[in-house]
Amino acid sequence: MAANMKAVKLRIKSVQSTMQITRAMQLVAGSKLIKAKQKAENSKPYFETLHATLTGIARDNNDFQSPYTRSGENDKWLYIVIAGDRGLAGGYNANVFKFMEEESEGRDVTVLPIGKKSVEHYAQHKVPILTKAFAEVAAIGVSDCFEIARMVCEAYAGGEFGHVSLCYTKFVSMMTQTPGVTSLLPLSDFTNPKGNRLMELGDAGTAASKSSGDSEIPEEEQKTETGGARELILYEPDSETVFNSIVPDYLAGLLYACINISVASELAARRMAMEAATDNAEEMIETLSLYYNRARQASITQEITEIVAGAEGG
């Protein structure tokens, strides 16, 4: 009995130590989550400004042509896949890879993995990888996004790939994060006046990027900004050159926003997972403590009984 009680006591201490770790990770994830959502929101003005400029150029030039708006010359796909650097985030990483498996089925795929888990996953599954230079999503900054965008644009313009898409995790709420994909190249939402919403932050705030069709600017003001005002703009050396030079910057802004949204999603998933782990640890400690106290009480009762029996026998 004594040995059993000692084992239970050690088990309680072990669970308490684990609970301290999970609670600390929960608090850290919650703190970082606020910063990640703010970074995604702060990237919105830059992205929207470039989007409006590209849309204006495409709209004001009927004979406009760009290698980035034409359909690819082949059926090869490049996927930029954003995953996490660590585990302990519920199904965050597994959901991304499962989604990508369904999305890329039957396609000639090359990936550009972002995040340690993404690099490890595709290396293990022997999927062609464009580069492993961006293995730590937490260390990626704006300059890295510009480098990735230039690399992708050069590969697409050179005919290496016919389609480029970005797989990231959308932040819907603290409880829900869903993997999704958005097409990067060829560009299509600039020739379509209505466009479409590319991504949303959900509870984190407003859309990190919107097309002009989803803009909250009144229709009359849109006409002024995208119509008469833009007709006075002179692009040097020409609008097509300006458009092509802006595209990499536009994609870099989109990529940076998506990375921050994915990081926010990972942190939310980790916070919820650690909260659940902490709750489970508390329940386990309560159960073990109850068992320990009962065993201790039984041991004391047995000792008293033995003493009384000995006294009566004497």
Please identify what each model-predicted range represents.
Residues 1-314:
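C-terminal beta-strand-loop-alpha-helix "lid" module of Rossmann-like NAD(P)-dependent dehydrogenases
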